[in-house]
Amino acid sequence: MSSAQAEDEQDYETPSCYELQKHFTHGGVAYTHVNEVWPGVYIGNEETARDRYKLQTLGITHILNAAEGEWNSVDTGAEYYKDMQIHYYGVTAEDTPTFNISQYFYSAAEYIQQTLSDPHNKLLLHCVMGRSRSATLFLAFLMLQQRMSLLQAVEQLAHRRHICPNWGFLKQLRELDTHLQEERRRTHT
């Protein structure tokens, strides 16, 4: 790491929820059912998750359902994909500001990282709309596995998909960002 990068990291401050939301609404891409947001990673909505032909066309080998459960969910499950040779992982997350989605940050990031360890794999990360829960988990992946700041992760994703994590999720991402920045500063001093 160059000294300029180290200095930038030391000067970095986690942006407010309001500042982050500006990145979602200014100059972003139009909403579509699915977008490739990283090599081998697609974020999509329920329609994409249920479209078996589309999944085959995209070459999807793994699915992370960020909306498993009974309320405001996508109830596909592993059984839905059993004849497609798709590895399924689901998390029960509600798209409400009070839901603790941070409990899934590390496990989801690890699942994404393991999936991408084989360059032939392709992952669909989805929720109902593909804008809040799935986007939040992918932002956490970028922060944890790719060592991006929250701002870098938001900029990376917002240029590729129309996202809108709820305020509670943004607060949890901000907490993760603060924790990771403090950890990185400790290791650089």
Curated annotation (Swiss-Prot):
Keywords: Cytoplasm, Hydrolase, Nucleus, Protein phosphatase. GO terms for molecular function: MAP kinase phosphatase activity; protein serine/threonine phosphatase activity; protein tyrosine phosphatase activity; protein tyrosine/serine/threonine phosphatase activity. Its EC number is 3.1.3.16, 3.1.3.48. The active site is at residue 127. It holds the Pfam family DSPc. GO terms for cellular component: cytoplasm; nucleus. This is Dual specificity phosphatase 29.
